[in-house]
Amino acid sequence: MLDIKLIREKPELVKKDLIKRGETEKVKWIDEILELDRKWRENLKKINQLRKERNQLAVQIGKRKKAGEPIEDLLARSNEIVKQIEELEKEVEALKKKIDYYLWRLPNITHESVPVGKDDTENVPIRFWGKAKVWEGFLESFKEQSLGKMDYEVLSWRPRLHVDMLELLRGADLERAAKVSGSRFYYLLNELVILDLALIRFALDRLIEKGFTPVIPPYMVRRFVEEGATTFEDFEDVIYKVEGEDLYLIPTAEHPLAGMHANEILDGKDLPLLYVGVSPCFRKEAGTAGKDTKGIFRVHQFHKVEQFVYSRPEESWEWHEKIIANAEELFQELEIPYRVVNICTGDLGYVAAKKYDIEAWMAGQGKFREVVSASNCTDWQARRLNIRFRDKTHEKPKFVHTLNSTAIATSRAIVAILENHQTEEGVVKLPKALWKYTGFKEILPASMKEKCCQD
């Protein structure tokens, strides 16, 4: 939520930012907010003046009573003032509701470094890491996607898609999951179960080493938490509701972590607060019909390790760089080639002032796919959830800044591992960083395991 003071003092800045975001229909809202705010403040002033007059009347009534003089005229005026105040208070409340309606539906103000663009095709790659395995048929496309800035190894054989690897390894049962739960669900099987859990522990260990406090949050939260952490559109497109209850299944650990300190005033000396949340995530994926319908890349349920930071406003941009660096280190240890993308205004979403994505090279698909998002939400969530801090007892509290970043979303990390670390024979060679967590170094195709058993 935006600060009303910002709209009062810099309305043109807010309008220009809305235009950059492509939210041109909301530009007129700013003038409407200013007019409503003018009336709201005007009515508050009238209420204060009337209260002052009523207090003065009370003094006069007291004096007249002592003097034995009539007070009927003063009482009549006092009663009239009470009615006027009641009417004005109703108007003030109605005006406040209208102002809040707009404020709660305005996006965050973007950072000056965010590129202007209409959609994800105009996101800007800013750095690349790793040596990509590229099938010769994908080579020209790869060079274009990597801007010629990434090392690569040309393969004469085409790496399998992760969905084919799942079948080859007997690592998941999608058919039976569809029978039991519908589309975009899966049974994870055999070594991939161990791999999923290994990825969680791997990410947790690395972030705990960096001072993050591990948290398993509630998997359901109340509506006020979701309203504070995300946009109203997500209630239709993303979030599952528990019927008959004021509870929603979390789409990410970010949301219960954002709500953890709702309506609190934090001690400034405790900042930054660093949390690493571990949870399942539940998402409707409405509006994605036809996208990634096969496999486990885009699903209704998955595990995720999430970084969450409460910081001082002046430190939040430094922390934004730190949390994306943390995620990069994880994917470097997993030996997954990737690019970091600066998300443009048209793809940014309402919550973030700036967002980086890590897009892993998927050797089977021949394209980069999102595996991490890292956002600086500045004070947008903190205002909605009323999370403040102060350094001294009697100091006026200020709003914190909140930041979040994926560490590992296990299903997407598994997709990246299957597509990048497979051999021509279909063996998956696991990165060394995971060996101590899995207890094995490779995953064999089911047919090879059967043959080994027979031999």
From Swiss-Prot:
InterPro entries: aa-tRNA-synt_IIb, aa-tRNA-synth_II, aa-tRNA-synth_II/BPL/LPL, Ser-tRNA-ligase_type_1, Ser-tRNA-synth_1_N, SerRS_1_N_sf, SerRS_core, tRNA-bd_arm. SUPFAM superfamilies: Class II aaRS and biotin synthetases, tRNA-binding arm. The keyword Nucleotide-binding applies. It catalyses: tRNA(Ser) + L-serine + ATP = L-seryl-tRNA(Ser) + AMP + diphosphate + H(+); tRNA(Sec) + L-serine + ATP = L-seryl-tRNA(Sec) + AMP + diphosphate + H(+). One of its GO terms (cellular component) is cytoplasm. Catalyzes the attachment of serine to tRNA(Ser). Is also able to aminoacylate tRNA(Sec) with serine, to form the misacylated tRNA L-seryl-tRNA(Sec), which will be further converted into selenocysteinyl-tRNA(Sec). This is Serine--tRNA ligase. It comes from Thermococcus gammatolerans (strain DSM 15229 / JCM 11827 / EJ3). The gene is serS.
